[in-house]
From Swiss-Prot:
Enzyme category, top tier: isomerase
Active site: 97 (electrophile), 169 (proton acceptor)
Annotated keywords: Cytoplasm, Gluconeogenesis, Glycolysis, Isomerase
Protein name from the UniProt record: Triosephosphate isomerase
Domain of life: Bacteria
Subunit architecture: Homodimer.
Gene Ontology CC, one term: cytosol
CDD domains: TIM
Catalytic activity, as annotated: D-glyceraldehyde 3-phosphate = dihydroxyacetone phosphate
Length: 256
């Protein structure tokens, strides 16, 4: 089946009120004619109100967020709930990013609980998976990815991936300027889809698998020619409207 590509910008810990308004204005101008690719941005949660207001009146760019907690309300200082994100119109929610796994010690079981919370709230989980450089060099890429996916399947069943997104991010390629070759990335994406297909071909056929390892305006087009790369989770290049637009349009063209 034809999967509609998704390109999502992860702003990480960047921006301000003014930056949010300015970047979204640039994105709206650059992406006004895009029809064949879904687009989302995940600003810092502090700026969701500015982003929601700036995105009003258009339907090309959806709003997302970079994290969520498993609790809906209560005495959980500093946390953000699914209901709060929905209140701002956020749809695509990143979980399991390597920076959360590394700096905040989030484990597969906890991330699976976040996945469940998002599904229960009717939001779209963007589950990040991927291996470190050491794991890559030790030939453990597939085992690591399978383990991270299986945490969700074991808790919720393979059907949980209906309408969900997986972002394969080789950790050694994030923010380093290194990137897997298109063939390397495709091989892992094909493995991920095959791993899910072993439980359900129908679920595997529809799940969006993004690539998230230093995607930029120079390497995007070649990555998107690969059959199992359904878009990108973009970091640094998402902070510049022209560069992000090139990536979106490359996905739209490749998957037309």
């Amino acid at each position: 089946m034809a999967r509609r590509p998704l390109v999502m910008g992860n702003w990480k810990l960047n921006g301000s009120k003014a930056f949010t308004k300015e970047l979204i204005a640039g994105l709206k101008a650059e992406l006004a004619d895009v029809k064949g690719c879904d687009v989302a941005i995940a600003p810092p949660v502090m700026y969701l109100a500015e982003a929601e207001a700036a995105l009003a009146g258009q339907s090309v760019i959806a709003l997302g967020a970079q994290n969520v907690d498993v609790n809906v309300q209560g005495a959980f200082t500093g946390d953000i709930s699914t209901e709060m994100l929905k209140d701002f119109g956020a749809k695509y929610i990143i979980i399991g990013h390597s920076e959360r796994r590394t700096y905040h010690k989030e484990c597969d079981t906890f991330i699976a609980k976040k996945f469940a919370a998002l599904k229960a709230a009717g939001l779209v989980p963007v589950l990040c998976i991927g291996e470190t450089e050491a794991e890559n060099e030790a030939g453990q890429t597939e085992a690591v990815c399978a383990k991270q996916i299986d945490a969700v399947i074991d808790a919720l069943g393979v059907e949980a991936f209906n309408g969900a997104v997986i972002a394969y991010e080789p950790i050694w390629a994030i923010g380093t300027g290194k990137s897997a070759t298109p063939a390397q990335a495709q091989a892992v994406h094909a493995f991920i889809r095959g791993h899910i297909a072993a439980k359900s071909q129908a679920v595997a056929d529809q799940v969006i698998i993004q690539y998230g390892g230093s995607v930029n305006d120079a390497n995007a087009a070649e990555l998107f020619t690969q059959p199992d790369i359904d878009g990108a989770l973009v970091g640094g290049a998402s902070l510049k409207a022209p560069a992000f637009a090139v990536i979106v349009k490359a996905a739209e063209k490749a998957k037309a």
